[in-house]
Regions:
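Short glycine- and hydrophobic/aromatic-rich loop-to-beta-strand nucleating segment
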Residues: 1-2, 7-8
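Generic, ordered loop/turn and secondary-structure boundary motif
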Residues: 8-9, 63, 96-101
């Protein structure tokens, strides 16, 4: 998920809500395999075999809590740098801000939210 510094500064409550909703969706996807496959079949028009394969192939790439480790951050920045033909890399702390994800994860965990 990406945002601008302007949106973070001007509408932090909106951004917090979007991040929290996204984490709820991720928790649902991770915990409700059959329902997620059925949803993919319905909304993407996939047959069960393909939807199941897609789920099984991708589930390991989904973040647990809305954050990614520093190595993943550096790799992502490097790919973007190459695509945009940027001469310099961007420091991870300038490109990533996980405070909204960490807070949403804390709130959901503390409240005992389950899909």
């Amino acid at each position: 998920m990406a945002s601008t510094d302007q949106l973070i500064q001007e509408k932090p409550k909106l951004l917090a809500g979007v991040v929290k909703a996204s984490l709820k969706a991720l928790r649902f996807i991770r915990n409700e395999r059959d329902a997620t496959i059925a949803t993919a079949m319905k909304f993407a028009g996939l047959d069960k075999r393909l939807a199941t394969r897609m789920y099984d192939d991708l589930i390991g790439t989904f973040t647990q809590n809305g954050t990614v480790d520093e190595e993943t951050q550096r790799n992502d920045i490097e790919v973007i740098r190459q695509i945009l033909k940027m001469p310099e890399t961007i420091p991870t702390q300038k490109a990533y801000d996980f405070r909204f994800a960490r807070e949403a994860d804390r709130q959901l965990t503390q409240s005992g939210w389950r899909p």
